[in-house]
Amino acid sequence: FIEETLKLRGNCDKSDVFRARRAKFLGYTFAEKTGRTLVHPKSFKRLKDKLRAVFCRARGGSLLRTNGELNAILCGWRQYFRLDNRKGVFEALDIHIRRHLRKLVWIAWKRPRTRERELHRRGLDGFRAWESANNGRGAWWNANARHMRDAFPLSFFKRHGLYSLLAMR
């Protein structure tokens, strides 16, 4: 039809017929049943690769500087993909980002004595702060533990200006 009736030449290497769910167009894909525009999984993967560079342990720096870099990436990315308004996907990404930031704080504190002092300063009682600081677990585990979520709740990150992907909905 395209070549005979419309007299157009098609590039067989680039052209294909497939389901809408498999399509990737400008970073978007389409829901199979509803046809809504969704962020393509490859676009999420590219965002996570960018975030991985920001969360690199060897970089050093303050939490505020990291927040600034994150906000530039997240705000631009979310503005571009504003047509996708799924709550669960963006909420999970927000939780993942906050966990990474808590991990960086845990690593920055370095010593159990510092960790205990800082946790106590942020509202944990003495024994719980001591127990959490000396638990012998890694930074990633501690970043999702109850003591770090109590010390650094969502309100802490809002107060320090971290951009929320979910708030854009």
Task: Describe the role of every protein-language-model region.
Residues F1-R169:
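Non-catalytic terminal/accessory segments
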